[in-house]
C-alpha cells in the first residue's frame, strides 16, 4: 500500500483517478475541467488527481500544438492546486525539468517512450515525489520489474523508503498505428510490488493513425476501463475534454467531460465487486 496525495493507494482500497485534458490549452479550460472533475469524484467518493501536460514533446508533427511551456504551465497547475484544493500531476521529459516540476506538483509522470532511460527514471524517483511510470508500448509487462527496481533503488539512495513508485499500462504496439491491451499485464506488473494504474484512453490511441496526428477509438474506453477494473487496479488514468472534437491534442481518444460521471459510476460499482471478491490468480499457479 502507498499513501500519496492525501489518500491510500492499493488493491485494498478503491481505485483512484488521474484525469484531465491531454495538454494545458488555457487557464480557463484547466479550471473548468478540474472543477467539474472534483465535483464528480467528490460525489462518487473517488480520490482524484488532476492531470494536464505543459509540453507534449512527442507530437506526430512538428507543427502540432505542444502546450504553453513549463513556466506558464506550472503556474496554471499551481493555481489549480491552490484554488481548487486538488492534487496535480504532470509529465516531465528530461532531467532538467525534474526539479522545477517536482517543486510544484504532487505526482510526477514519465512518458512511455522514456521508461528505459535509466538516469531520467532515477532522477524522477530521487525527488521522493510519487512517480507514475508508464510502460513503453514496446515493453513486455514483466520488463517493468527492472524499471521499478531502478526507480526504487534511486529513491532509497535519496533517503526515501522506495514506496513512491507506480507503474502504468497504456497498451502495447500491435502492428502499425495500433495498440492492444493485454489484461494479463495488470496482474504481471503487480510483481513489481508497485501500485498498478491502467491508462484507459491512451490504450485506445491509434498512434500516428491520421498522418500528422494520432487517431483514437474513444468508444472502447469504457470497454477497456471496465476490463481493467474487473482484473483489479489501484488506479485509472483517463484524459477528458469538454469538446474532444476541438481538443488540441489526443481528442480522438478523450472521454467527453459530460460523460465522465456516468462512466465513473459504473466503474465504482464494478471496483467494489472486484475487490470484495479478491484476487485468485496466485491460486492457479
Swiss-Prot record:
It is found in: Cytoplasm. Keywords: Cytoplasm, Lipopolysaccharide biosynthesis, Transferase. Belongs to the KdsA family. Its EC number is 2.5.1.55. One of its GO terms (molecular function) is 3-deoxy-8-phosphooctulonate synthase activity. Pfam families: DAHP_synth_1. Pathway: Carbohydrate biosynthesis; 3-deoxy-D-manno-octulosonate biosynthesis; 3-deoxy-D-manno-octulosonate from D-ribulose 5-phosphate: step 2/3; Bacterial outer membrane biogenesis; lipopolysaccharide biosynthesis. Its main location: cytoplasm. NCBIfam families: KDO8P_synth (TIGR01362), PRK05198.1 (NF003543). This is 2-dehydro-3-deoxyphosphooctonate aldolase. It catalyses: D-arabinose 5-phosphate + phosphoenolpyruvate + H2O = 3-deoxy-alpha-D-manno-2-octulosonate-8-phosphate + phosphate. GO terms for cellular component: cytoplasm. GO terms for biological process: keto-3-deoxy-D-manno-octulosonic acid biosynthetic process.
Amino acid at each position: 500500500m502507498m499513501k500519496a496525495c492525501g489518500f491510500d493507494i492499493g488493491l485494498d482500497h478503491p481505485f483512484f483517478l488521474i484525469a484531465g485534458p491531454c495538454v494545458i490549452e488555457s487557464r480557463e479550460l484547466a479550471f473548468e475541467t478540474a472543477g467539474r472533475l472534483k465535483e464528480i469524484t467528490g460525489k462518487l467518493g473517488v480520490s482524484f488527481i488532476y492531470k494536464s501536460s505543459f509540453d507534449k514533446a512527442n507530437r506526430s508533427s512538428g507543427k502540432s500544438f505542444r502546450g504553453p511551456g513549463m513556466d506558464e504551465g506550472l503556474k496554471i497547475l499551481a493555481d489549480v492546486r491552490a484554488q481548487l484544493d486538488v492534487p496535480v500531476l504532470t509529465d516531465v521529459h528530461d532531467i532538467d525539468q525534474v526539479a522545477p516540476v517536482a517543486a510544484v506538483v504532487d505526482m510526477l509522470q514519465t512518458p512511455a517512450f522514456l521508461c528505459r532511460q535509466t538516469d531520467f527514471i532515477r532522477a524522477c524517483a530521487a525527488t521522493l515525489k510519487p512517480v507514475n511510470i508508464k510502460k513503453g508500448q514496446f515493453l513486455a509487462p514483466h520488463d517493468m520489474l527492472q524499471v521499478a527496481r531502478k526507480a526504487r533503488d534511486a529513491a532509497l539512495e535519496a533517503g526515501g523508503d522506495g514506496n513512491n513508485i507506480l507503474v502504468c499500462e497504456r497498451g502495447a504496439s500491435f502492428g502499425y498505428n495500433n495498440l492492444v491491451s493485454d489484461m494479463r499485464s495488470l496482474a504481471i506488473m503487480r510483481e513489481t510490488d508497485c501500485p498498478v494504474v491502467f491508462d484507459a484512453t491512451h490504450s485506445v490511441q491509434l498512434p500516428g493513425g491520421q498522418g500528422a496526428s494520432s487517431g483514437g477509438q474513444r468508444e472502447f474506453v469504457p470497454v477497456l476501463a471496465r476490463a481493467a477494473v474487473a482484473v483489479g487496479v489501484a488506479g485509472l488514468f483517463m484524459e477528458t475534454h469538454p469538446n474532444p472534437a476541438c481538443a488540441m491534442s489526443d481528442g480522438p481518444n478523450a472521454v467527453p467531460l459530460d460523460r465522465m460521471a456516468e462512466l465513473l459510476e459504473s466503474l465504482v460499482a464494478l471496483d467494489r465487486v472486484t475487490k470484495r471478491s479478491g484476487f485468485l490468480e496466485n491460486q492457479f499457479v
